[in-house]
């Protein structure tokens, strides 16, 4: 009996930890080849001036964030099912988006840059429908354990933790800024880049997925993917 009690307590503690586990997710749209080429071109430019930045690769997938939320890890399958219903009812591949400018989010002397698309009505409706669908499975916040981290960079920037916590409503609806992140560079360089004329172009989503977020808000680990072809 003396042996069983600690074992039961250990089992109970592990179960509670599993229940409390949280994942920081990004429900996103994967852009077509037109956007991919432009994003990769810009990423190469940024890496030349800031080699310590990141390349667009398997752990930094080019994408358009629709929503970012903290969800209970135990409910991930329910999140996928809820998102699938919304995506199946929307003609996502038929959405035509216009990329019209560069932008960046400043962080001290550097900035996280991207290509911005206009937030058209179809995209805003998709976002709102996804927010409603996954709300039953969300929690208010998380910590570094909710994200993909590396041994060299184990602590997530507190500003990112806060950003995901307040994505709804601070980055949704009228505040939605659909974009494809392209990399990191010194703010001085990015200011010059933004001052130059931007050649607008149109593109469409080619797919949708759920990713676990990493540092800089990157799509670091694919959790679920959908084929949206009609």
State each model region's role.
Residues 1-3, 86:
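A generic membrane alpha-helix/interface feature
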Residues 2, 15-18:
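N-terminal targeting/docking segments
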Residues 3-12:
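Sec-dependent N-terminal signal peptides
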Residues 17-107, 120-209, 213-230:
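Basic, often amphipathic N-terminal segments
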Residues 110:
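Conserved active-site/ligand-binding neighborhood in enzyme cores
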Residues 115-119:
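A short, structured beta-strand-centered segment in the mid-to-C-terminal lobe
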